[in-house]
Swiss-Prot record:
<feature type="binding site">
    <location>
        <position position="362"/>
    </location>
    <ligand>
        <name>S-adenosyl-L-methionine</name>
    </ligand>
</feature>
<comment type="function">
    <text>Mitochondrial S-adenosyl-L-methionine-dependent methyltransferase that catalyzes the formation of 5-methyl-uridine in tRNAs and 12S rRNA. Catalyzes the methylation of uridine at position 54 (m5U54) in all tRNAs. Specifically methylates the uridine in position 425 of 12S rRNA (m5U425). Does not affect RNA stability or mitochondrial translation.</text>
</comment>
<dbReference type="InterPro" id="IPR045850">
    <property type="entry name" value="TRM2_met"/>
</dbReference>
<dbReference type="GO" id="GO:0008033">
    <property type="term" value="P:tRNA processing"/>
</dbReference>
<feature type="binding site">
    <location>
        <position position="312"/>
    </location>
    <ligand>
        <name>S-adenosyl-L-methionine</name>
    </ligand>
</feature>
<keyword id="KW-0808">Transferase</keyword>
<dbReference type="InterPro" id="IPR029063">
    <property type="entry name" value="SAM-dependent_MTases_sf"/>
</dbReference>
<keyword id="KW-0489">Methyltransferase</keyword>
<dbReference type="GO" id="GO:0070041">
    <property type="term" value="F:rRNA (uridine-C5-)-methyltransferase activity"/>
</dbReference>
<dbReference type="GO" id="GO:0005759">
    <property type="term" value="C:mitochondrial matrix"/>
</dbReference>
<dbReference type="InterPro" id="IPR025714">
    <property type="entry name" value="Methyltranfer_dom"/>
</dbReference>
<keyword id="KW-0698">rRNA processing</keyword>
<keyword id="KW-0819">tRNA processing</keyword>
<feature type="active site" description="Proton acceptor">
    <location>
        <position position="486"/>
    </location>
</feature>
<dbReference type="GO" id="GO:0030697">
    <property type="term" value="F:tRNA (uracil(54)-C5)-methyltransferase activity, S-adenosyl methionine-dependent"/>
</dbReference>
<protein>
    <recommendedName>
        <fullName>tRNA (uracil-5-)-methyltransferase homolog B</fullName>
        <ecNumber>2.1.1.35</ecNumber>
        <ecNumber>2.1.1.-</ecNumber>
    </recommendedName>
</protein>
<feature type="transit peptide" description="Mitochondrion">
    <location>
        <begin position="1"/>
        <end position="14"/>
    </location>
</feature>
Amino acid sequence: MHNPRLFLSRAGFFSKPGLLPWDTGRPPDLSQSLLGRAYKGSFTSVIAKKHPSRQKYQKKQRHCRDDSWQERLADVVTPLWRLSYEAQLKVKFEAQKKLLQSLESHLKVLHGVSDTVAAHQSEGLRCLLHPIIPSPTTTGYRNKSTFSVYRSPDGNPKTVGYYLGTWKDGNVVCLPCNHLKNIPEKHSQVAQYYEVFLRQSSVEPCLLFHEGGHWRELVVRTNRQGHTMAIVTFHPQGLSEEEVCVQKVTLKDFFTKGPGAICELTSLYFQESTMTRCSHQQSPYQLLFGEPHIFEDLLGLKIRISPDAFFQINTAGAEMLYRIIGELSGVNSESLLLDICCGTGVIGLSVAQRASQVHGIELVEQAVEDARWTAAFNGVTNCEFHAGRAETILPQLLKSQKDEKLTVAVVNPARAGLHYRVVRAIRNCRTIHTLVFVSCKPHGESTRNFIELCCPPNSAKQLLGDPFVLREAVPVDLFPHTPHCELVLLFTR
């Protein structure tokens, strides 16, 4: 019998190393090997065993052909690239099924009975597991890419691409990623010309903060209309404001008048930052030229996207995801919809015409401004968006609701899952009868959220409301060639 305390522990069942939380032995084909053995290693290591010629990356760099470097990077960034897309979907579907089986098993232990899950029988589950929804596009699907600056295998510090190696082993290099299946040509082109800019710049890149240097990472965002936004991060170190301005002009001239003009950027941003990652509030994005926002047409809405606003990286796949969320939510004219971790507000806005009222909550202030603009531009009048931490805003918002409208909650948190106070607020709000939980990493901290939502009432943890019941699950593939997918879960009570 499983130990529920182990499952509930942060260091427990689903936080083991590896990508999938189980071990099913040694099936014969590659896709089954990925399923069965990733628990002890990774998809990359399993694939490598099928190709003995690729040796394990060593601390001391050894001479290696370009194609081998490219394969190594592909194995890290897109571990499933060697499989057909049909085989990839099989791997992902089985992953979600195993996860849900484990979840149901542990819920049964916690309750001592099986009444915490629905009565359906599907794929060995009591909840209804739908077939995985494939991505409409499988190549070049990313609408946002982040490129690092570091030393190439030949030692050139002005190289733009993705990291390969580990800092612990001291073998990190930076490799161009134009060969990766999920990167659009436009993103690779902008990265290539940023590298050209760096190599002709008199200012050194910032590889490690304590080593000095200035030029840092590049972010590229695109939409389906072909518009391109680039964001360059710069560490000022000891430069004066005037010296920083000179570098901004140099960068702008390169992409407007110089070789980089071929990229045809719609907008170019500059962020001066002394931190690894920071928000617009901490260090404002400075528009060097072009449009301040990028726009996307989605589900009949014109969506505005700011430089640091969250937007699903697979636009075509996101449309399918949002339709499924809307269908599962069952929102109607009597419903109040809470869109928690709403980003630019697309989920709430897309179902607003069916709901009585929509409240969206998002941490990133720029994203909230985008959501408000999108609502106004599209004539949506029954949506309100709130900027701040969900664990602070949600309890206050629920207390302010004086009527007894049936409340539907949709949560789409980051990989870290929901804050405990948010889970507690949802659990203890007796008007919330339907919850749609969207997770891009259901085997991580989100699993803890599922347990807290469905476990028996616990006064010590202030989980006093009736437990939710897992009814349906829909895997949606937004990340072809990687082991990840979105899992949409419907809970009711």
